[in-house]
Amino acid sequence: MSHFYDLAPKDKDGNPFPFSNLKGKVVLVVNTASKCGFTPQYKGLEALYQKYKDRGFIILGFPCNQFGNQEPGSDEEIAQFCQKNYGVTFPVLAKINVNGDNVDPVYQFLKSQKKQLGLERIKWNFEKFLVNRQGQVIERYSSISKPEHLENDIESVL
């Protein structure tokens, strides 16, 4: 894939979710898990989404079970967990791999655009990538970066 907008991962129902529909939006992409110490970040992510969604901001959650088997549920179970426990209204897409031989093209692209400490691989759940309105990956945040600490960067590209 040569461009962010060429990507089309699957949503939780198995339907394509074409990133071409995101043109002109600021996008925060996050690999998520329901049984992780960072899972409470869902609350902060939802707060960011509510604060900025009317200004062209969207968050995409990608569940992943590659770190400590902390996302064992089905796509439907994951979506229900997010809504019930954290009131998540931003899109939570189908479970994917973010590293390894079966890495999803979304993460293959994101990691190639922004390395973390010189490394491409995702180190843990809740790493975040900020994509500007032109589809360029402008920042990558580690798992320990709390959603509220991203506000200045989000504001700067809205």
From Swiss-Prot:
It catalyses: a hydroperoxide + [thioredoxin]-dithiol = an alcohol + [thioredoxin]-disulfide + H2O. PROSITE patterns: GLUTATHIONE_PEROXID_1, GLUTATHIONE_PEROXID_2, GLUTATHIONE_PEROXID_3. Induction: By oxidative, osmo- and heat stress. Its EC number is 1.11.1.24. Keywords: Antioxidant, Cytoplasm, Disulfide bond, Mitochondrion, Oxidoreductase, Peroxidase, Redox-active center, Stress response. It is an enzyme of class 1 (oxidoreductase). Disulfide bonds join C36-C82. Gene3D superfamilies: Glutaredoxin. The active site is at C36. GO terms for biological process: cell redox homeostasis; cellular detoxification of hydrogen peroxide; cellular response to oxidative stress; hydrogen peroxide catabolic process. Pfam families: GSHPx. One of its GO terms (molecular function) is thioredoxin-dependent peroxiredoxin activity. InterPro entries: Glutathione_peroxidase (IPR000889), GPX_AS (IPR029759), GPX_CS (IPR029760), Thioredoxin-like_sf (IPR036249). Belongs to the glutathione peroxidase family. The active site is a conserved redox-active cysteine residue, the peroxidatic cysteine (C(P)), which makes the nucleophilic attack on the peroxide substrate. The peroxide oxidizes the C(P)-SH to cysteine sulfenic acid (C(P)-SOH), which then reacts with another cysteine residue, the resolving cysteine (C(R)), to form a disulfide bridge. The disulfide is subsequently reduced by an appropriate electron donor to complete the catalytic cycle. In this atypical 2-Cys peroxiredoxin, C(R) is present in the same subunit to form an intramolecular disulfide. PANTHER family: GLUTATHIONE PEROXIDASE. Monomer. This is Glutathione peroxidase-like peroxiredoxin gpx1. It comes from Schizosaccharomyces pombe (strain 972 / ATCC 24843) (Fission yeast).
